[in-house]
From Swiss-Prot:
This is Acyl carrier protein phosphodiesterase. One of its GO terms (biological process) is fatty acid biosynthetic process. Its EC number is 3.1.4.14. The keyword Glycosyltransferase does not apply. Converts holo-ACP to apo-ACP by hydrolytic cleavage of the phosphopantetheine prosthetic group from ACP. Pfam families: ACP_PD (PF04336). It comes from Escherichia coli O157:H7. The gene is acpH. Belongs to the AcpH family. InterPro entries: ACP_PD (IPR007431), ACP_phosphodiesterase_gpbac (IPR023491).
Length: 193
């Protein structure tokens, strides 16, 4: 899962949106550095990552990547799941329009920004103003996201080419998303994530 899915599942679970978004920027035990609700959100994010990576649908989808891009398949798929969530938001969350959810999520996250790591602050400088969560529905933007990550981290250069795997398996990936994401939403609503 990437930013949008983590925020969405956190909302459904009544967990800290801030902690769920912050988690990828925190190493080790967060309990010394953040309030308990944010710590709980960080731990939820980590559980979701482990759960998602081990779902049969996700493991199967990783196998569809070519040998030269398979190493970055988990990252590419995380971004792709956000594409499908953004694209189908009105079906999955009909009572909370995506633009309203993004404003709500931003308000939640801004509360912890002053005490956050510099890389997280930098992310927030772009995430909200450039409307990433809404733009995820556009595959051209997904390609830009993958290229941007590859540019910032040369060892992830294969992300550029992973775009072709997404394009080749788009319909099958969308089917897999519909198989597992509603289950995860139900788990989040039951606070079972």
């Amino acid at each position: 899962m990437n930013f949008l899915a983590h925020l969405h599942l956190a909302h459904l679970a009544e967990s800290s949106l801030s902690g769920n978004l912050l988690a990828d920027f925190v190493r080790g035990n967060p309990e010394e550095s953040f309030p308990p609700d944010v710590v709980a959100g960080i731990h939820m994010h980590r559980r979701i990552d482990v759960l998602t990576d081990n779902l049969p649908e996700v493991r199967e989808a990783r196998e569809w990547f070519r040998s030269e891009t398979r190493r970055v398949a988990p990252i590419t798929l995380d971004v792709m799941w956000d594409h499908f969530l953004s694209r189908h938001w009105s079906q999955l969350s009909p009572d909370f329009p995506l633009q309203e959810f993004v404003c709500y999520a931003r308000e939640q996250v801004m509360t912890i920004l002053p005490d956050s790591p510099p890389r997280f602050i930098n992310l927030n400088n772009y995430l909200w103003s450039e409307q990433w969560l809404v733009r995820y529905r556009d595959m051209d933007f997904i390609q830009n996201v993958l290229n941007g990550m590859a540019s910032r981290r040369p060892r992830l250069d294969a992300l550029r080419d992973s775009w072709y795997d997404l394009d080749a398996h788009y319909a099958a990936l969308e089917t897999r998303f519909w198989q597992f994401y509603p289950r995860m939403m139900a788990q989040a609503s039951r606070k079972a994530l």
